[in-house]
Amino acid sequence: MAAEAEEAARHNNIKALYDNIRVLTNKFKKSSRPVKDKLGNTLKTAEEQMKRWVEHFKEVLNQPPPPHDANIQPAAAELPINCNRPSKAEISKAINTLKNNKSPGPDNIPAEVLKADLETSTQMLYELLGKIWEDENIPQDWKEGHLVKLPKKGDLSICDNYRGIMLLSVPGKVLNRVMLERMKKTVDQKLRDNQAGFRQNRSCADQIATLRIIIEQSLEFTSPLYTVFIDFQKAFDSLDRSVLWKLMAHYGIPKKIITIIKNIYT
């Protein structure tokens, strides 16, 4: 295995080198925990546990659509967002913004590999992303990922007490970042002022500060105040994606970009 890693390095085969190093260092060690089925029975074999995890995430990630179709109308005109193929400058910037020391997707290509030779990586992705942009066809490898479960609170033998994250292809994230940068500034101007989450230079801390001011004023003027806190169960996992495409059209996102994003998830 060490000889294979050395040979891969000699031939500049970064992917093979990374694969061999990962095996040699035994970086990922599987830990076994008891897993219970829906009835609370402990599953003993690895096969039974795997089937239970598959069952759990299928249910979480494939929620039935809402009973009534959302009546969301598209904008009268599209926003002035660049719909040309990604430029080399955009791709290079997107690569540089990728975070290091993050687990890669199934292709085992981490961000560090793309950054090691930025010029070559940019040129290769320029050709690839250009074809993807023209054909609106996303590589199947970019649609697949490693599903990793992260423990939350409570009994860790119960599947509901885990949060799943998907490790996707890093080169695929370059395309996502290019589209995000194109949309971000223009779309931000269309969002409601009271939305703080998922916005640049704003966070939920802004909402907490606002709520505190409202409470203090209510106490000062002895006026009644009613607050409602809603915690949606598995909010992001249970979204109906067909509604997302309608919302994007409602905000004026160009059809070209919606189609490409939609094809990532189908």
Regions found by a protein language model. Name each.
Residues 4:
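Conserved nucleotidyltransferase catalytic core and NTase-mimicking acidic/glycine-rich helix/loop elements
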Residues 11-161, 166, 173-174, 191:
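Surface-exposed loop/turn segments and immediately adjacent short secondary-structure elements
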Residues 34, 91, 98, 102-109, ...:
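Conserved catalytic palm subdomain of right-hand nucleotidyl-transferase polymerases, strongest
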Residues 54, 122-126, 168, 172, ...:
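Hydrophobic face of alpha-helices
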Residues 65-91, 137, 142-146, 185-238, ...:
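Active-site-proximal segment of RNA-dependent polymerases
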Residues 252-253:
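Helix N-cap/coil-helix junction residues
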